[in-house]
């Protein structure tokens, strides 16, 4: 998993919402720093049953208290440049060998998402 935001990024959290109602936080970075471009791994494998949803929540700070805020009086919009903002979470999955990658993932309407597969996707 990775967290990618720009200079106004404040925090990001990944949560699994299981079909039985259980919620499990799998990554929580409460003090994001633009200078950190890290990938995070899990200590233990998590079995994710069909119907589980991944929710990623992030916040941004354009206040005078953020030393990276160039002009707190201006609105910030999404974009590719560092002075613009983005929320680009990434997660890699290892699929059970009996799961068809084409049906393992669905995205919410209106959301932009990418599903990556590779020859290493077979589970042990």
Spans of features found by a protein language model:
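His-enriched metal-coordination microenvironments in redox/metal-binding proteins
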Residues: 1-102, 110-124
